[in-house]
Amino acid sequence: MGLKGRLFRAATRMLFHSHAMNVVNRCANGYELSADGSAVVFPYVRKRRGRNLQILIYHRVNDEGDQFFPGIPTGVFARQMEYLASDWNVLSLEEALERVKQKDVPDNAMAITFDDGYRDNFLQAFPILKKLSLPVTIFLATGVIGTGRMLWHDRVFSAFRETRIPFLEGIPNESDHHDLQTIESKLTAQGKVLRFIWSLGEDDRTRWIDWLVTKLQVPGHQDASKTMLTWDEIRLMHRQGVSFGAHTVTHPILSKLSSHRAVEELQQSKAAIEHELQAPVRTFAYPIGRREDYNEDTKRFVREAGYACALTTVPGTNTDTANPFELRRATPWDEDIAAFAFRLNLMKWSS
């Protein structure tokens, strides 16, 4: 961590353990502190800003220390959830959406989501969420649930993690070969490869990843049965209040697909979850989820498939005027709880 990062952590810890965090929180909610420290409400601030819904996005919670696809350490996740339970109004995604629709978003509104369907969501995150009675929605890429297959990006992560070759040549738009002799150099090459893959259509993506796995001299197929959730685990969590949404079948970038294939991915993932849980699925999250990964046609296909909303990975919060098919989410990068708390309050204030 550089000097800037250390200074940020020191400053946020000081704020977190002082009265100043309350100032940030009250200002974000449309309050101003009077001289004696009491809160004075300014309704015009609320009217101008509205009340924001924040949605957090997680993928993995574990203590593996995998630098190629890092998860949130279990202890850090527990502290984050304890903070949310004590200081925020954590709603189920379904309730949060209804409150947005009714323009009745409460103060400090928060929803918690996970993408993809990793097994550590059940083994590590679920016990913490259950203990704290916090609602959560998990978006499933159904093609890898209970199949032993890996998501395409996990194939890339695994290939770079396991390869022992000293360098890689052949990355399009890259003139030089890439050193792979250190973790840092592998991560640099992995980042460039992912950016290239994101630009490809579905068939080209599959062919190129197959080429990459062969080039890096790692097994072409790896069993992911211990990595992804099973339907039995999903049903157990569902019976205990966890909500599940769709995240397509194969985790493609929808804007790169033909209309027919995009509709297939949306309909089939929804149908698979509804069949397994015998319950309607109304929520969806775009794979990758950047602005360029969906478009107006995509949003229309999502709506016509019967979903009530779609979540992006575009950073930010959501007001009661937000487009339900373009909801923003925040990624909780900060492992330091003071920085985590400060950043959430700052986002609420700055939105």
Predicted regions and their residues:
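Extended, charge-rich helix/loop segments that form flexible
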Residues: 7, 12-14, 19-25, 31-35, ...
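Acidic/aromatic-lined carbohydrate-recognition and catalytic surfaces
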Residues: 106-177
